[in-house]
Amino acid sequence: MNAINWKKLLLPNIPYLFFVYLFDKVGQAVRLSPGADLSGKVLSLGEGFSMAFANPLPSFAPMDLLIGIAGAVLIRLMVYFKGKNAKKYRKGIEYGSARWGTAEDIKPYTDPVFQNNVLLTQTERLTMNSRPKQPKYARNKNILVIGGSGSGKTRFFVKPNLMQMHSSYVVTDPKGTVLVECGKLLQRGGYRIKVLNTINFKKSMKYNPFAYLRSEKDILKLVNTLIANTKGDGEKAGEDFWVKSERLFYCALIGYIWYEAPEEEKNFTTLLEMINASEAREDDPEFQSPVDLTFERLEEKDPEHFAVRQYKKFLLSAGKTRSSILISCGARLSPFDIKELRDLMETDEMELDTIGDRKTALFVIISDTDDTFNFVVSILYTQLFNLLCDKADNEYGGRLPVHVRCLLDEFANIGQIPKFEKLIATIRSREISASIILQSQSQLKAIYKDNADTIAGNCDTTLFLGGKEKTTLKEMSEILGKETIDSFNTSENRGREVSHGLNYQKLGKQLMTEDEIAVMDGGKCILQLRGVRPFFSDKYDITKHPNYKYLSDYDKKNTFDMEKHLRRRPALVKPDEPFDYYEISEADLQEDTDHE
């Protein structure tokens, strides 16, 4: 049983001791008043009060005490029932208390140093400090940005935040325009520039997912991401059995490559060669392909090997079934038939695990019209989040030294990042944040289904730049809430005599209705921060930023030349490959820079 809270029980009733005293004195006054009957005592009650209050102490006569206690109990019951039946009035907010936020509302969430903020609107900013002096003002830096085509997602959100230069950045860059316009600025700020270009492989740095495999768990994550974002063979590709069989086969081959292959062969090219060397014959159950023989030798060497255990499960299927699985695997990895893609993923220059160590800007250039190679981007983001979380936990006590902001423009075109709904809930404490940029909320639901609401719920900030998609408009209007407005009606009755009437009343109205949001001025936006009233503000004016003069928007001389940047990067030299070595003085390097 719960212990009685005497403090809570007694403190509210202390004032009623006064009524015990008061009624006790009344009882004493009546008792001391002269008179043989009640009417006589009432007439001389004044004299009785004089005698009763001659001594300020309460009367301890039993009847006086009883009257005192009874009177106090009566008053307590009257107060109780009056409070219980009291009408609750909320004057001015009867139908809703929604209103637009003010400068005072956002002030506790803003850093006084301009550069230490996330830029949201022209007047609202959010501090990058994840541990403010008052914990109640702490907000994660995950942001959901929604804006239809042409609403300015890049100009009014991505570019202003790149100009802040307070973090490492991972930017999804449709068409590659952000890199061209902001690259020189970031170089000036001391950033390393990394580029993965899935539109033009020749203008990309190398990315090899095998370089980031640290354990068997990483192999499973790589396989799951690959399967989630590629297509197998026809109808069978979507069936659970075939997908599970493919997963076993991929895990076996990648496990073998990771454990047994030389360093220079740990890539997708080797995986394709092993798949091409695999064969299953329905009419010859005893037939063994070169891959079968390879795993047989490995089993003799280590029967408990991860790759062997996976491959033996794969071999449990019949020859005809294995043949179908191999066809599906070939179809799924058909993009790797392109030599440029194989070359791109042969070695690695991305250094994904170091992005949280020093200021780095990684630009992921994707096509906004073709998603053929977006599975590569999905693999990169999956590995990036896992690598950074592991490094924060294992090397930095849970927090990266440099915050990593992922500006995920055209998030719907990236593909599916497995378990993203869990990642976005946990990356905050590691000094990682994600800005999910969409054209409409329905895009998120199309990819992540039931987990879309979980992902959106883990974004403390929502920025709506404009759009006309019905679901988004409805949700925005509902979240803004209702305000209470005054209304009056006039009436006119015509009969023998004309009479007029005027009726005032209060009504509830959405702070902004769906149609009002749909026709919102192109220079306005709606900002919602958890625990704060929404803001109806101007979009950020990029030309007012102190670093705007370093963008190519301001001066074409600031245009970033990706090809020149790639030529300057250190060459990748394979083992035993001859190469030339030169020494360049600092003066020569400065002279070359001046000529540019």
Please place each PLM-identified region on the residue numbering.
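General secondary-structure edge motif
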Residues: 98, 125, 129, 141-142, ...
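Short secondary-structure boundary micro-motifs
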Residues: 128, 153-154, 223, 337, ...
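P-loop NTPase motor domains
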Residues: 25, 139-432, 447, 457, ...
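Basic- and hydrophobic-enriched, low-structure N-terminal and domain-boundary segments
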Residues: 1-151, 155-158, 482, 493, ...
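A short glycine-/small-residue-rich loop at the edge of a beta-strand within enzyme catalytic domains
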Residues: 107-109, 114, 375, 411, ...
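Conserved long hydrophobic alpha-helices within structured protein cores
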Residues: 113-120, 375-383, 476
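Conserved ATP-driven motor cores of ASCE-family P-loop NTPases powering translocation/secretion/packaging/pilus
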Residues: 424-526
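Low-complexity, polar-biased intrinsically disordered regions enriched in Pro/Ser/Thr/Gly
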Residues: 126-132, 231-241, 486-505
